[in-house]
Amino acid sequence: EEQVRAALKKDAQSVDAIGLLALIQGARGDTAAAGASYRQAAELAPQRGDVLNNYGAWLCANGSPAEALTWFDRALADRTYASPASALGNAGGCALKAGQPERAAGDLRKALDLDPNNPYALESMARLEAGRRNYFEARAFIERRLAAAPATASVLQLAIQIEQGLGDKVAAGRYQQRLVKEFPDAATATPGANAL
């Protein structure tokens, strides 16, 4: 953090340094400061897709999914943005949180067209399909998600819910065992605790 602050003393308008400061602030739990830094970076670089995507992701994670969608749209308008799959995946997951399943499906499918192994997009598609009770489709997405990146407690809980929806007690039990082994603290919570 000291190096970032030193860089900002040299150039108070350094978007990259401000973005890094936002990451540091968020990691240490200073949510308000992180949000202010992300917003400052976005205002200083209104055409940079990476910066706009980061601010949108922060907004979505902090309870403003509808507002976040406008920032993802702005990020995607940057034709030089090197990671549109990231912004599309974030937009899709955020649209799901905002209660816009049709937009979510469209953005997530576009993200997966660009990056078929995007873990967040795969998890969000599994969540979307499970919410629609399309459990076979949800299973396919959760299996791809588990192959693409290490499991998290929420992913394993979602896998349990999907297998329960399919009536496959054996597969649900396997995921439950993994949850207990890999995330003992999360395993004590109700497996259905994470909303679809």
Q: Which role fits each region the language model picked out?
A:
Residues 10, 43-45, 78-80, 114, ...:
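Structural marker of alpha-solenoid helical repeat scaffolds
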Residues 14, 48, 82-84, 118, ...:
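Residue-level recognition of tetratricopeptide repeat
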Residues 145-196:
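Terminal, low-structured helical/coil segments at or just beyond the last alpha-helical repeat
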Residues 17, 51, 85-87, 121, ...:
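TPR alpha-solenoid repeat register
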